[in-house]
């Protein structure tokens, strides 16, 4: 699959996960992206041809099958988005509106929680980088930490534990689910 080498191992864990906890500070998570948004993001890759970008978009969309599978059941998904993610114009306004509207729809699905970490949270640990925690079974066991060079996958218990604490701290700063949905609906309207 056409994923960065640093992320490729995590796609296996993602497919086996019973729960995913995801914090993003700059972009909509790949599992939640629309095709148009993904295309806009992936088009920023230097030296990529249109065919390569379309292959990457198709791979990203295929990953989303994990959210609609029945056997085994889809993982529970807990997503924390920095408010700036909703406002960052990475694509044309209609693409941004469709993307934020898509997030609203996803947030209404069983097993999906999307919460917004508002600007008013000020400085917080999430500003240092995005991360995903995959729980397989009852134990949170694998973390992918993004950085400027791609990222890394780790099963180190201390690192996973720190990521869980960071996630819990960020979640305590996040708006409640209903308020987050209201914010996303308002932002979607602003993109029109």
Task: Pin down the residues of each PLM region.
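Interdomain hinge/linker segments and adjacent boundary elements that couple functional modules
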Residues: 1-87, 155-158, 165-192
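C-terminal regulatory/effector modules of DNA-binding transcriptional regulators
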Residues: 73, 80, 92-192
